[in-house]
Amino acid sequence: HRNEFGISKGAYWSPKGDLLAFYRMDESMVTQYPLVDITARVGELNNVRYPMAGMTSHKVTVGIYNPETQKTIYLNAGDPTDRYFTNISWAPDAKSLYLIELNRDQNHAKLCQYSVETGELIGTLFEETHPKYVEPQHPIVFLPWDNSKFIYQSQRDGFNHLYLYGTDGKLVKQL
């Protein structure tokens, strides 16, 4: 995924720095789009793969690499076609990885928890829908004094708000 939905990097170290979550992107099926580099003294043509609306999009999987064992597991998130995975966040104990799965229409988001050991889905904590657009921009942030609660940022009512949730997926309150 490109610089959208709050994604500004492709790798995320665990809290202790012993595991690395990362995006793996296959864009071989995406049509090339020509861009002119106007910063060069003489303009140069650069082809980039960009999934235009209605055309085939890239496929992304999320992996977790263990440098000590040199093993990688991939999250069992199902078919990555026409889905975005964003807002990656580690559980404080690094046993779970949280991310938001967003459909290509960008109107249905799910906060999902995955096992770091197996890559299996532990559960969907909550879902957010909107008739027009859901734009998850920020990963969840766990409270430093209470690992059973986290803050989620959303514009679900048209304004940017912070929400306090429990790791059971239940809304505690709007902050």
Predicted features along the sequence, with ranges:
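A short loop-to-beta-strand structural motif that recurs across blades of beta-propeller domains
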Residues: 61-63, 110-112, 161-163
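Beta-strand C-termini and the immediately following turn/loop, strongest in propeller blades
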Residues: 9-12, 21-27, 52-56, 92, ...
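Predominantly five- to eight-bladed beta-propeller fold
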Residues: 1-12, 19-74
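Short glycine-/Asp-/Thr-/Trp-enriched loop segments that recur within the blades
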Residues: 1-7, 79-85, 130-138
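Short loop/turn segments that connect beta-strands within beta-propeller blades
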Residues: 66-70, 116-119, 166-170
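Long hydrophobic segments that form regular secondary structure
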Residues: 67, 71-103
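A short beta-strand motif characteristic of beta-propeller blades
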Residues: 1, 71-77, 123-130, 171-175
